[in-house]
Amino acid sequence: MPDKEGHPSPQEMDLGQVLAALADPWRRQVVRELAAAPEGTARTCASFALPMAKATRTHHFRVLREAGLIHQEDCGNARLTRLRRAEIDGRFPGLLDLVAAETPQPSTADPQAAL
C-alpha cells in the first residue's frame, strides 16, 4: 500500500502506470533531468522551469509520484523531488537508461518551436 504521500513500494510499482506516467513528454523531461543529476539529487518542482501553470505542474509531479518514479518530501514551503533510481532499476532494469537516451523532439521539448 502506498505511504501517506502516495509513494508506492517497489513491489507495488505497476509497469502500466509507470509507462502511462512516462507517456507525457514533460514528465519524461523531469525524469531525464533527474536521471542526469548525481544520485540522490533533490530539486524543487519550480527548478524544472516547466512552461505551465503551477496546478498543472503539481498534477504532473503527482502522476510521477504515484507511479513510483519520484520521491517527494516537504521542506518548509518547498517540495523536494528526487528520482527513485535504485528502486526503478531494481524493478524495471534498463527503463531509466531508455528514458535518459531519448532525444527530445522539438515539438515535445518546446511547444513554441512548432509555431
Spans of model-derived segments:
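A general structural signal for short secondary-structure boundary/capping elements
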Residues: 65-67, 78-81, 97-99
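Generic signature of intrinsically disordered, low-complexity, basic-rich segments
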Residues: 17, 51, 63, 109-110
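Short beta-strand "wing" residues that participate in macromolecule-binding interfaces
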Residues: 72
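Canonical helix-turn-helix DNA-binding module
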Residues: 46-69
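Amphipathic alpha-helical dimerization/coiled-coil segments
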Residues: 1-16, 32-37, 84-115
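N-terminal helix-turn-helix DNA-binding core of bacterial DNA-binding proteins
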Residues: 17-21, 25-53, 75-87
